[in-house]
A protein has these predicted regions:
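Short, C-terminally biased terminal segments at protein or domain edges
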Residues: 1-114
């Protein structure tokens, strides 16, 4: 599924980039951005597995969208703290926006994914 692949790719790129964050961020920004970006994929996987149950599917895609939005907030912090460059931020944010659009399509059209 395209949205899962895009989410997984972004989560891995965020992980690799976050390895460069200061050590004092390990239990705050670093762990939060890793957790939220990975959670996008885990919620997609859980929801897709139970896609025959429309309410469950929509709920999990909505959870995934919320985690995606949280990831964008952490990216804002990473940019403001100068842990990532504007170029990296723009790339990650653009990819996250695309994931959000795909998730919203799935939320609005769950019958297409049964």
């Amino acid at each position: 599924m395209a949205v899962y692949k895009k989410g997984f790719s972004l989560a891995m790129d965020i992980y690799r980039e976050s390895k460069k964050f200061p050590k004092d961020e390990l239990y705050s920004l670093t762990s939060q951005i890793r957790r939220s970006s990975r959670s996008v994929c885990s919620n997609i996987g859980e929801g897709y597995r139970k896609r025959q149950y429309e309410a469950h599917f929509v709920s999990k895609m909505s959870d995934s969208d919320m985690e995606n939005t949280e990831t964008q907030v952490w990216l804002d912090f990473a940019l403001s703290c100068e842990y990532i460059t504007k170029e990296i931020f723009d790339d990650f944010n653009e990819r996250s926006e695309e994931i959000g659009r795909l998730l919203n399509h799935m939320i609005q059209n769950p019958e297409k994914y049964k």
